[in-house]
Every structure is written in C-alpha cells, then in structure tokens.
Regions:
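Generic ordered-secondary-structure signal
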Residues: 2, 21-24, 45-46
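Single conserved hydrophobic/aromatic residue that forms the stacking wall/gate
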Residues: 2-9, 13
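Conserved catalytic cores of phosphodiester-cleaving nucleases, focusing on short active-site segments
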Residues: 7, 22-28
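Generic recognition of cysteine residues
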Residues: 12-13, 25, 100, 193
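Compact beta-rich and alpha/beta scaffold cores in large eukaryotic transport/transcription complexes
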Residues: 16, 26-28, 36-64, 210-245
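Acidic, metal/cofactor-coordinating or nucleic-acid-engaging core segments within structured domains
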Residues: 18-19, 29-185
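Extended, amphipathic alpha-helical scaffolds
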Residues: 146-245
Length: 245
C-alpha cells in the first residue's frame, strides 16, 4: 500500500512538473489599476514634421510652449505655423515588429488614434475606434470597415495580445503567455472572470473597458520636436489602461 501511495504521489508530482504554469491577472477598480500597456519610451510613435521648414528659433519657441504635459498645445502650434505632423514609424524596432504581427499597417492606425486622443480629447478605445472608422487612415474599402468591422477587429486583437502577454520590448511571436485571463473586481466589489478560452467575450470586455492614457512627457521623452539626421520628429506615447469606473 505504501508503495502504491508513493507511486501515485510520484505520478501526480510528475504531471504537475509537466503541466504549464497558468494564472489570472487581477485588476480592481477598488485599488490601483495597473495598465495593459505601459512601455515607457519603447512605446513611442514618431511623426515627421513636414510642410514648412522651421528655423531653430521657431522650434525652440514651439518646444517651450505651455506646460510639460500640454502636448496638444504644441501640436496645434505646429499646425498654426504651417507644419504638418505625418506618421512616420515606431521608435523601437522590436515594438514595431510586434505591432506588425497584428497587421502590417496597424502602427499607422495606432498613430492616428494617438493624434485623435491628444487633439480631440477622446480616450476610450471604443470611441477612438469609431473616430478612426470615419477618418479611415488606412484608406480601406467601406465594406471592410462596416461589414467586416476591420478597425474594431484589429483593435480587439491588439488588446487581447496585450492582456495575454505582449510587451513592447519583448519579441512577440503570437504565442500566448501563461496568463489564462483576468479576474476583474468592479466598483461594487463583484469579481468577474474573463478567460482566454472564451476569446470573444474577453475581447469585447477589453474593447469596451479600455482607454488610452497620457504618461509623463519627461519620463517617456515625447511631445516635443526633436532633430534626427536633419529631420524634425514629434513623438507620441502609447499607454493603455482599463477604465477606472
């Protein structure tokens, strides 16, 4: 009997060793809400300043405008002076490749969403996606936009990838991490469970309950005109969190 019991325990132990480690992320509206994406300067997107060629004194004047966090004010000043901010690239090559795993043109879509967030004050992902459908930065056909819900689909893919382990500075190959889902504590203290096994429900939850957030311009080095190889660029930072209410 002892031999049988020890053998049984050994079998259980072996299975536990071989089984993948899985777990749930906990997010609570009753406490500190950790973001889905907080990549720091790795998550910066670059816009090339075109149109009028600014002299150095003008650039200095633009960069000195407003408070540190008045990114929209500096963007509007560039426009008033005849400049154009045109999406150029993702600042970090690993994050660029990660975003391209969602879609080769997805970085451009995110860039336009960031522009709208700062200039129009829209932060909810669902509202930003609706705005992007009207702008159609990828110039896709109406059938893709409305019948196939292209922009919503791509955004949900991205949010799911973030929730299940994508990070800006780590190479993403489409394979989910050990995270099985979210345990979400709402404002009433109720615990809701969203599992990756039910991807559609999980994706819909993330889409409706996520927002773009503004990080520190000083810490993440964005929101100013910067010169690189004779060209001026203006960076915007991508940070995504869950709604706090």
């Amino acid at each position: 009997r002892d031999d049988v019991e020890s053998r049984g325990l050994g079998d259980v132990y072996k299975r536990q060793i071989e089984a993948p480690l899985v777990g749930f992320c906990v997010r609570s509206r009753l406490g500190t809400m950790f973001p889905l994406l907080d990549g720091g300067r790795t998550a910066n997107l670059k816009f090339e300043q075109t149109g009028v060629k600014f002299a150095t004194p003008t650039v200095n004047k633009i960069n000195a405008f407003g408070e540190e966090d008045d990114v929209a004010g500096r963007m509007l000043m560039i426009e008033r002076l005849g400049g154009i901010l045109k999406y150029n690239d993702v600042a970090d090559k690993v994050f660029r490749s990660n975003l391209c795993m969602i879609d080769l043109h997805f970085p451009r879509m995110l860039g336009e969403m960031l522009r709208v967030m700062h200039l129009d004050g829209i932060s909810k992902v669902s509202d930003l996606t609706e705005a992007i459908k009207q702008i159609n930065p990828l110039k896709i056909k109406d059938e893709l936009i409305h019948k196939h819900s292209y922009y919503e689909y791509k955004m949900k893919q991205f949010l799911m990838a973030l929730a299940l382990g994508m990070r800006p500075a780590k190479i993403f190959n489409g394979i989910d991490s050990a995270i099985s889902g979210f345990l979400f504590v709402n404002g009433n203290g109720e615990v809701l469970c969203y599992q990756k096994a039910d991807r559609q429900v999980f994706a819909d939850f993330l889409f409706v309950n996520s927002r773009f957030e503004k990080s520190s311009t000083e810490k993440d080095k964005y929101g100013y005109l910067e010169r690189e190889n004779g060209v001026y660029y203006f960076k915007l930072n991508l940070k995504i969190g869950l709604l706090k209410r």
